C-alpha cells in the first residue's frame, strides 16, 4: 500500500511539473488580431520584456515587413507583452527571434535540419506546422 501511495505521489508531482512547464497564451483580442494577421501570435512568455520592447519599437522593419500599428494599439499590445513576458536568460534572444532563445533550442534540439526545411514546415518560426493551435493555448 505504501508503495502505491509513493508511486501516486511521484506521478502527481511529475504531472504537475509538466503542466507548469506548458506555454499558454493569455487572452488578448487585439494582440491575437494584430500579431495573428501575419503569423501565430506567439505566447508572450517566449521573450523577455526587453526583447518585446525592442521588437515592438521596430515594427516598421519587422523581419523584413512593415508591421506598424497605431500608437494606441502598439502601446496596448506592448503593455500586454511586457506583463506576460518570460524572464531570465532562458527566454532572451539577442536577435529577437524566438528560435534563437535557449528555451527554443532546448525544446527542439532533437529535430534535425532536414525537418526545418521540409516544405510543410518551411522554417523554425512556423510553430503551427508541428504543434497546430496548441501553441496558441487553444
Predicted regions located by residue number:
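Sequence context surrounding c-type heme c attachment/ligation sites in exported
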Residues: 20-79, 85-138
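Sec-dependent signal peptide recognition
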Residues: 2-8
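Residue-level micro-sites within transmembrane alpha helices that shape
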Residues: 1-2, 13
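Hydrophobic h-region of N-terminal signal peptides that target proteins for export
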Residues: 9-18
